[in-house]
Amino acid sequence: QLERDYLPHEREARIAGKPIMGVGAVFPISNWPTYQTGDYKFKEMPDVQRVIAMDLGLINDKTVISLMYWHPYEQEAWLHSQVVVKGIDEANPMSYINHLLRPEVFGCPIVLPPDASTVGRYTMSSLSLRQFLESYELNVYPDPIRNPPYSEGRITNIKSYGINVMRQMIEMGTFRINENCQEFIHEATNYHVDPQGRFSDPDDAVDSARYALLACLNGWAEPYDGMTPQQRMATARDRIYDIKDRLHQ
């Protein structure tokens, strides 16, 4: 009967006890668009940008740090890596700050949720997490994560917006997931919404990826040129001096 009534991926989901379309599944994906590290040479790809997003958790949740690459003209995204911090460690940012200070990601813009500005909430100190990260000279985007504005300029924080965009891109194959992001794939495979519109838990990895995608859609990602902020500033100064020299010739 399963073979007669359901498609192959629906049969697999039912046998595994996973939600499928029609019973609240958010990502009814049979073949996830995954890739392996090394499949894409992001540093050599023209116009590629990148951003880091953080979903913050306390003792019973996870803190998830996502690195995403983005092609603004092709509207393609790559969820390249996720660092998942669980348990007591996530309440202390010193346990994961080193992931943000690594040379290969230092200087990458970091986007945070609104409550990252709450003093002591995620730091157990007199600093907010935003202030804590800024004290390490990290490139923290000044505004909290939000949905892109509508055509009339109105801004909302409706969660379903980012989820729906992510689902559509996954279905089209323009949102690719590094196969190492198993936490995301596990959460997304089991992600569902109830009749009242409430999304299931856990969704920390999904939310972190959603924040990164929203940052890309807002135009907050920055070009991936392999430079540090200091090198970018030096290059900008050289460019300005060159322009001035030409004007005075």
Name each model feature, range by range.
Residues 24, 60-63, 119-123:
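Short acidic/glycine-rich loop or secondary-structure boundary segments that cap or lie
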Residues 1-57:
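ATPase catalytic-site recognition across NTP-hydrolyzing enzymes
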Residues 69-73:
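Short loop/turn segments immediately following beta-strands, especially the blade-tip
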